[in-house]
Amino acid sequence: MRIVVQRVSHASVTIEGQCKSSIGKGMLILVGIEESDGQEDIDWLCKKIVNLRIFDDESGVMNKSILEDGGEILVISQFTLHASTKKGNRPSYIKAAKPEISVPLYERFCKDLSRALGKEIGTGTFGADMKVELLNDGPVTICMDTKNKE
């Protein structure tokens, strides 16, 4: 699984002109799933996300997790995170999982992340044409890949 975490002041996702989800201060997470992903990847990411210290403490130092800061999370599925630009100029998405694999994993990821956070999270709709709005805070943007745990 590959994710992009952005610290935001607020974020929302709109589908067909209707706001599906919106959050205040917290994280916007874009998530891409590949064929070989499974529960181990979900578990590692959920633990890492809720404990990631990217929120400022009283001294202005990024020393607090979203659990400590009380922020919200909005998760958006994004198969394009697995784009390969190795050949030519048109990205290939061959590494992205097909919907029959990625939809259940995305839903499980959202459910498990909500449980780890201790409250409901916002989500987009898998496969929909979404308009995502956000106000980056910092900006702070962190990329994580369960196949390359650095």
UniProtKB/Swiss-Prot annotation:
InterPro entries: Daa-tRNA_deacyls_DTD (IPR003732), DTD-like_sf (IPR023509). Transmembrane segments: none annotated. GO terms for cellular component: cytoplasm. Homodimer. An aminoacyl-tRNA editing enzyme that deacylates mischarged D-aminoacyl-tRNAs. Also deacylates mischarged glycyl-tRNA(Ala), protecting cells against glycine mischarging by AlaRS. Acts via tRNA-based rather than protein-based catalysis; rejects L-amino acids rather than detecting D-amino acids in the active site. By recycling D-aminoacyl-tRNA to D-amino acids and free tRNA molecules, this enzyme counteracts the toxicity associated with the formation of D-aminoacyl-tRNA entities in vivo and helps enforce protein L-homochirality. A Gly-cisPro motif from one monomer fits into the active site of the other monomer to allow specific chiral rejection of L-amino acids. Belongs to the DTD family. This is D-aminoacyl-tRNA deacylase. It comes from Bacteroides thetaiotaomicron (strain ATCC 29148 / DSM 2079 / JCM 5827 / CCUG 10774 / NCTC 10582 / VPI-5482 / E50).
